[in-house]
Amino acid sequence: MKIKTFNSEIRIPHSEFERGNNMSNEIWIFAEQQEGKVRKVAFELLSVGAEFSKKTGSQVAAILLGSGLQEAVKSLIPFADRIYLIEDPALVSYTSDAYLTNMAPFIKEHQPSILLGGATSTGKDLFPRLATHLQTGYAPDCTGLATEENGKLVAKRPLYGGKVFAEMTFSEARPQMATVRNNTFLVNQNINKSAQVISISSHTDPSSLKKKVLGLEKAAGTKLDITEAEIVVAGGRGIKAPENFKMIEELSDVLNASVGTTRATVDEGWRDQKDQIGKSGKNISAKLYMAFGISGAIHHVLGIGTCKTVVAVDTDPNALIFNYADYGIVGDLFQIIPALTEELKKAMKE
């Protein structure tokens, strides 16, 4: 693997993967599913794969594991040329050993050119294990992807807390593997493929599994993660104190929204890092994003690029956030937020 940052180049040695005659030119997307529903990031990556295929002539395949996946398969058909389906009751919920047992031999046999997945908790656990097993390179937590005509993948990811970006390329080992942050790319709804579904026999031996998921429980009273929320209300340093986020919370309750924030407030210890939006935090793709007291630094706005509508409120008429907003209000958030909250409450009672 080769990493390039600015004008310097670092070479990372790895074991060479012995390529056989079965190496394919396919682009594979790990179609992660939860409770039978394919996660949005998989459709983002299938859309990227479709763009790559125009340049490389490759076919795009989704690899899907689980049980009772009829609806998941149906949702993937327009986005891929092939769907490799591995169904087994032991794969209903993700466990690293069950997924690795099934995916690693199949990938090693077919050797796709590229394998992409979401930088989710599952992807972050599975992909390093796969890369180690396959003795190939892996670029984690990427915020950009490109490909050359010869099929070489170029993966872009932040380093040092988002202070710099690295461009990573791969040597001859295959597949070229990367995980990508949610909401990095838009989903192309106009691909209109008609995938061939290929069922693959499961290699799972339940008696050999080290872990078993007994059940899943959703935490009571918690809001959606900001990467999945349709409405996100965020506060920045302009909030002035951590206790003032109570206003943001009240507004978010009225809107049934999730609460986001900036790196500055996280560094101050005002908010949790899980709510941070930006290149060193999370990308969001909300239908409505409301930014209060956020100046609009580049490391923040990189995380809102796929939001549909952006509303910004700041006292500074020259704040950079207004360059990215569909609607901007120059004013005092301490007056605007309570007034907006009350008006919304009244409107919802009518």
Question: Where is each model-derived feature located?
Answer:
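N-terminal glycine-rich FAD/FM-binding segment characteristic of electron-transfer flavoproteins
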Residues: 19-350
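Short, basic, low-complexity termini and linkers enriched in Ser/Thr/Gly/Pro
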Residues: 1-19
